[in-house]
């Protein structure tokens, strides 16, 4: 497996996870 591609995918999924977590926190605060 391409290590660079794996790291890139991990970074993207990590950012996506943080974004969804932030949105969930905002919705819970409303």
Swiss-Prot record:
Domain of life assignment: Bacteria
Record keywords, A-Z: Fimbrium biogenesis
Protein name: Fimbrial assembly protein, serogroup B1
Source organism (scientific name): Dichelobacter nodosus (Bacteroides nodosus)
Gene transcribed to yield this protein: fimB
């Amino acid at each position: 497996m391409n290590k660079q591609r794996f790291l890139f995918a991990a970074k993207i999924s990590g950012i996506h996870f943080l974004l969804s977590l932030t949105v969930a926190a905002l919705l819970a605060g409303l």
